[in-house]
From Swiss-Prot:
Main localisation: nucleus
Keywords linked to the UniProt accession: Cell cycle, DNA damage, DNA replication inhibitor, Nucleus
Name this polypeptide is given: Swi1-interacting protein swi3
Protein species of origin: Schizosaccharomyces pombe (strain 972 / ATCC 24843)
GO cellular component: chromatin; mitochondrion; nucleus; replication fork protection complex
Renumbered residue ranges of the record's region Disordered: 1-47
Record's subcellular location: Nucleus
Length: 181
């Protein structure tokens, strides 16, 4: 008899536990905030941030876009220097923001200063200067050397993907940026 009484006591406890679980489940359904993770949900990969490197500077949104923007700028000249400077700085501000939106204008300028020292950028810059000189009909080699001596040409080895032949090596001159710093 004692086993029958203990079996019925166990059954009662099991039934009570089941009822309590059902009540808890019903209460949880009523107060479901949707905070529990769903195994079916997939995390969205983070958007890759653009790097501010020489590839980006040389790309279509880099210096070529700046050259196109410069053609649209109309400077008034003598007597309007402040307005012209404001217009140029505004254009540069827009260009740097489009090139790398996460950086401030001051940060962008410091990045550009650093990137301008890379060999591939120097070679491209010299090519663009020569293109402009040909368009204007002037000699671009006169502006090649800005230092006190004309022996500041850098001896470079080819191996850069931007250098088409060894004649491009002559386009690269040393920067005299130490005066500015």
């Amino acid at each position: 008899m004692s086993t029958a009484a203990s079996d019925s006591g166990v059954e009662k406890l099991v039934e009570e536990n089941k009822r309590e679980e059902v009540k808890k489940n019903e209460e949880e359904k009523e107060f479901d905030l949707g905070l529990e993770e769903n195994p079916d949900s997939v995390k969205k990969p983070r958007k890759r941030l653009a790097k501010f490197d020489e590839e980006r500077l040389i790309s279509e949104n880099g210096i070529p876009k700046l050259r196109k923007m410069m053609r649209k700028v109309k400077l008034k000249g003598k007597g309007h220097e402040a307005k012209d400077l404001k217009q140029l700085l505004g254009m540069y501000h827009i260009w740097t923001h489009e090139l790398y939106p996460r950086a401030t204008f001051d940060d962008s300028i410091s990045y550009l200063k650093t990137l301008g020292k890379h060999r591939s950028v120097k070679v491209r810059r010299r090519g663009w200067i020569n293109e402009i000189a040909v368009e204007n009909g002037s000699d671009s080699n006169a502006s090649l050397f800005t230092g006190p001596s004309s022996n500041s040409l850098v001896n470079l080895t080819s191996g850069d993907p931007y250098v088409q032949d060894t004649a491009d090596d002559a386009f690269v001159a040393q920067d005299n940026d130490t005066q500015l710093e």
